[in-house]
Amino acid sequence: MEASGSAGNDRVRNLQSEVEGVKNIMTQNVERILARGENLDHLRNKTEDLEATSEHFKTTSQKVARKFWWKNVKMIVIICVIVLIILILIILFATGTIPT
Protein backbone atom coordinates (compact mmCIF):
# COMPACT_ATOMS: atom_id res chain seq x y z
CA MET A 1 0.00 0.00 0.00
CA GLU A 2 2.88 2.35 0.76
CA ALA A 3 4.32 1.73 -2.70
CA SER A 4 1.10 2.88 -4.36
CA GLY A 5 0.85 5.87 -1.99
CA SER A 6 4.48 6.78 -2.68
CA ALA A 7 3.93 6.43 -6.42
CA GLY A 8 0.85 8.66 -6.14
CA ASN A 9 2.85 11.28 -4.24
CA ASP A 10 5.58 11.16 -6.89
CA ARG A 11 2.99 11.63 -9.58
CA VAL A 12 1.46 14.59 -7.74
CA ARG A 13 4.92 16.14 -7.27
CA ASN A 14 5.68 15.65 -10.97
CA LEU A 15 2.39 17.28 -11.93
CA GLN A 16 3.03 20.18 -9.52
CA SER A 17 6.51 20.56 -11.00
CA GLU A 18 5.07 20.64 -14.52
CA VAL A 19 2.41 23.14 -13.46
CA GLU A 20 5.11 25.33 -11.89
CA GLY A 21 7.16 25.12 -15.11
CA VAL A 22 4.15 26.09 -17.23
CA LYS A 23 3.39 28.92 -14.79
CA ASN A 24 6.96 30.25 -15.13
CA ILE A 25 6.79 30.05 -18.92
CA MET A 26 3.45 31.90 -18.97
CA THR A 27 4.84 34.59 -16.64
CA GLN A 28 7.81 35.08 -18.97
CA ASN A 29 5.48 35.25 -21.97
CA VAL A 30 3.32 37.91 -20.30
CA GLU A 31 6.44 39.93 -19.40
CA ARG A 32 7.63 39.69 -23.01
CA ILE A 33 4.24 40.81 -24.32
CA LEU A 34 4.24 43.81 -21.98
CA ALA A 35 7.80 44.71 -23.01
CA ARG A 36 6.80 44.37 -26.67
CA GLY A 37 3.86 46.71 -26.09
CA GLU A 38 6.17 49.28 -24.51
CA ASN A 39 8.58 48.92 -27.43
CA LEU A 40 5.73 49.40 -29.90
CA ASP A 41 4.62 52.57 -28.08
CA HIS A 42 8.18 53.88 -28.14
CA LEU A 43 8.46 53.03 -31.84
CA ARG A 44 5.14 54.75 -32.56
CA ASN A 45 6.35 57.90 -30.79
CA LYS A 46 9.61 57.86 -32.73
CA THR A 47 7.67 57.40 -35.97
CA GLU A 48 5.47 60.41 -35.21
CA ASP A 49 8.55 62.50 -34.38
CA LEU A 50 10.23 61.39 -37.60
CA GLU A 51 7.13 62.25 -39.61
CA ALA A 52 6.99 65.75 -38.12
CA THR A 53 10.71 66.24 -38.71
CA SER A 54 10.43 65.05 -42.31
CA GLU A 55 7.58 67.50 -42.99
CA HIS A 56 9.69 70.34 -41.58
CA PHE A 57 12.67 69.22 -43.66
CA LYS A 58 10.52 69.06 -46.78
CA THR A 59 9.18 72.60 -46.39
CA THR A 60 12.61 73.98 -45.50
CA SER A 61 14.29 72.27 -48.44
CA GLN A 62 11.61 73.57 -50.80
CA LYS A 63 12.17 77.12 -49.52
CA VAL A 64 15.94 76.77 -49.94
CA ALA A 65 15.54 75.33 -53.45
CA ARG A 66 13.21 78.16 -54.41
CA LYS A 67 15.65 80.74 -52.98
CA PHE A 68 18.58 79.36 -54.97
CA TRP A 69 16.46 79.07 -58.11
CA TRP A 70 15.67 82.79 -57.88
CA LYS A 71 19.34 83.54 -57.26
CA ASN A 72 20.20 81.66 -60.45
CA VAL A 73 17.49 83.47 -62.41
CA LYS A 74 18.76 86.84 -61.16
CA MET A 75 22.33 85.92 -62.11
CA ILE A 76 21.26 84.83 -65.60
CA VAL A 77 19.29 88.06 -66.07
CA ILE A 78 22.28 90.15 -64.92
CA ILE A 79 24.64 88.29 -67.28
CA CYS A 80 22.19 88.70 -70.18
CA VAL A 81 21.86 92.44 -69.49
CA ILE A 82 25.66 92.85 -69.36
CA VAL A 83 26.10 90.89 -72.61
CA LEU A 84 23.34 92.94 -74.23
CA ILE A 85 24.96 96.22 -73.14
CA ILE A 86 28.33 95.06 -74.48
CA LEU A 87 26.72 94.03 -77.79
CA ILE A 88 24.95 97.38 -78.07
CA LEU A 89 28.22 99.21 -77.38
CA ILE A 90 30.05 97.11 -79.98
CA ILE A 91 27.34 97.77 -82.56
CA LEU A 92 27.29 101.50 -81.78
CA PHE A 93 31.08 101.72 -82.05
CA ALA A 94 31.06 99.68 -85.28
CA THR A 95 28.41 101.83 -86.93
CA GLY A 96 30.11 105.02 -85.84
CA THR A 97 27.16 106.27 -83.82
CA ILE A 98 29.52 106.70 -80.89
CA PRO A 99 32.76 108.37 -81.97
CA THR A 100 35.98 106.82 -80.72
UniProtKB/Swiss-Prot annotation:
Residues the record marks as site: Binding to STX8: R32
Keyword Iron applies: no
Transmembrane segments: 75-95
Segments on the Cytoplasmic side according to the record's topology features: 1-74
Pfam families reported in the protein's UniProt record: Synaptobrevin
Family annotation (SUPFAM superfamilies): SNARE fusion complex
Vesicular compartment residues: 96-100
Any Gene Ontology biological process: protein-containing complex assembly
Modified residues (Phosphoserine): S4, S17, S54
GO CC terms in record: azurophil granule membrane; basal part of cell; basolateral part of cell; basolateral plasma membrane; cell surface; cytoplasm; cytosol; early endosome membrane
Identification of the protein by name: Vesicle-associated membrane protein 8
